[in-house]
């Protein structure tokens, strides 16, 4: 359905171009623009419906082992208001966060927290992550996942609040703070952050900006160099950045801004939070050269407390260690071993068989 809508929008755009060259067609062009806008709005409405359905699915997939909740919190105001004097301008941005708590948690004890930002550019936290969240909860982790500004499934207004590498970083840290402030079973001294792709990018910037808030981090196939990324992506992708209110220009017109939003160019902020980085040579989304730049930058700055692994042509490309084949599970066990070393969950996996049983029900 989404593809059909996209095709129709393109057809209307084509008609607009043809008609604009002919006199007397202004009213028709305006009508076509309105229809195109309606199609875009429909696309967002369908995203909302899909999100509501997927939220129900969480209970089906994790309800046996986790208390599941979704709460409404705030992050900082928009970096740039379209109407600075308008009603509500300057108000904090409102967004949802997911919470997963082990059903067998003892209210008299405290448990480690994993902050788990989803990928992007525009995306959301959905049941794609089912097995990974099951694996985390089964080890005794409390998990929170922020639907930070720009996330899909919440309408056009939320979608257009995107601030890639900007205030979305604070949104994710706000989810951490909310959990500490509202749940006595969360151990504020045992908080880690883990994410893949844009989620890995957010994990990096959180430990760069808030090093005292996280004991450990994992960044899987993280977007790392936006300047390089704009060079190998197409124009449609570049527009996702230049059209953001907080960025406003393409990379060739504002290199400084894109550099500021690139982890590989900001490694001087890294304060030695234990960090594991994974990348894959056949990644079809985040080219390995971005992560190689990040790794080389960390080394050039003399940073020591990070480890990395560059996997060679692993099946799944960008998704290689989030998939369900055995080798992906073995790689995730390495990730959990890294996190567990610093967060000490009550029931850490000792083998891939433990992971298999927890995530999939059977060995």
Annotate the PLM regions.
Residues 23, 57-89, 99, 337-363:
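Extracellular/periplasmic ectodomains of large secreted or surface enzymes and adhesion receptors
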Residues 77, 148-363:
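Active-site-proximal cap/loop segments of hydrolase catalytic domains
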Residues 97, 143, 306-308:
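Generic structural signal for residues in well-ordered beta-strands
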Residues 4-13:
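Sec-dependent N-terminal signal peptides
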Residues 62-95, 103-189, 196, 231:
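Cap/lid segment of the alpha/beta-hydrolase catalytic domain
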Residues 13, 19-69, 359-363:
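N-terminal targeting or regulatory segments adjacent to alpha/beta-hydrolase or S9 domains
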């Amino acid at each position: 359905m989404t593809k059909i809508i996209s095709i129709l929008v393109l057809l209307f755009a084509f008609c607009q171009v043809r008609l604009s060259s002919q006199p007397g067609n202004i009213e028709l062009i305006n009508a076509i623009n309105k229809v195109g806008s309606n199609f875009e709005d429909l696309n967002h409405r369908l995203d909302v419906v899909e999100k509501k359905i997927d939220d129900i699915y969480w209970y089906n997939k994790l309800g046996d082992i986790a208390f599941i909740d979704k709460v409404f919190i705030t992050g900082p105001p928009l970096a740039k208001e379209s109407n600075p004097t308008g009603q509500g301008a300057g108000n904090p941005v409102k967004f949802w966060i997911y919470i997963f708590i082990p059903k067998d948690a003892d209210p008299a004890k405290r448990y480690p927290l994993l902050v788990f930002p989803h990928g992007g550019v525009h995306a959301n936290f959905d049941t794609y992550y089912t097995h990974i969240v099951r694996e985390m909860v089964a080890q005794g982790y409390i998990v929170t996942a922020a639907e930070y500004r720009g996330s899909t499934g919440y309408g056009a207004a939320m979608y257009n609040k995107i601030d890639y590498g900007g205030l979305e970083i604070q949104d994710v840290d706000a989810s951490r703070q909310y959990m500490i402030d509202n749940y006595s079973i969360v151990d504020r001294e045992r908080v880690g952050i883990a994410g893949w792709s844009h989620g890995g990018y957010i994990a990096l910037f959180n430990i760069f900006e808030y090093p005292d808030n996280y004991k450990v981090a994992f960044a899987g196939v993280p977007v790392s160099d936006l300047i390089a990324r704009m060079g190998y992506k197409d124009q449609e992708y570049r527009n996702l950045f230049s059209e953001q209110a907080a960025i406003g220009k393409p990379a060739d017109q504002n290199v400084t801004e894109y550099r500021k939003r690139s982890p590989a160019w900001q490694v001087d902020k890294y304060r030695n939070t234990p960090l594991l980085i994974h990348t894959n040579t056949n990644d079809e989304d985040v080219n390995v050269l971005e992560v190689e730049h990040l790794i080389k930058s960390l080394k050039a700055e003399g940073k020591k407390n990070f480890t990395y692994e560059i996997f060679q042509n692993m099946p799944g490309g960008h998704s290689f260690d989030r998939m369900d084949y055995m080798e992906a599970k073995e790689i995730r066990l390495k990730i959990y071993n890294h996190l567990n070393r610093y967060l000490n969950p009550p029931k850490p996996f000792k083998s891939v068989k433990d992971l298999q049983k927890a995530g999939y029900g059977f060995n």
